[in-house]
Amino acid sequence: MKIIVCVDNQNGMMFNHRRQSQDRVLRKRIMELTGGKKLWMNAYSQKQFLQVNGNMPKEQEQSGQLGQSGQIQADEAFLEKAGPGEPCFVEDRSVAPFAGRVERVVLYRWDRAYPADLYWDLSLEGWTLARREEFPGSSHEIITKEVYIP
């Protein structure tokens, strides 16, 4: 599977059960990165994608039953269910237990330090930084994309 994750300068991912930040341009780039294929995530992450794209029906939002919506595949066990080559957007959980299944990591760096209590925990020692690029976001002057391969 391919892991997509956003981190701050200290590899922080969340603080007090909340994402550190989000960015509209970044979400669009993540959707483009998947090339229209299935993108795995949990319901917490799915909310930010659906609300921004404006395609979450009110009754689904109110009921909390998000399920699947086209390209986005929401499931609390998404890291267990994702198949080879399938992208997974991770915000709120450890990836280390799935290290043996990870084929690629796409790290988006916020270029800021935020408070954090959950950190990226998959060591990239021995991995190759295949590509690095910077781009302006909607709420961040610079977001850095790093692609790692084993």
Which residues fall in each region the model found?
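Enzymes that bind and transform nitrogen-containing heteroaromatic metabolites
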Residues: 1-150
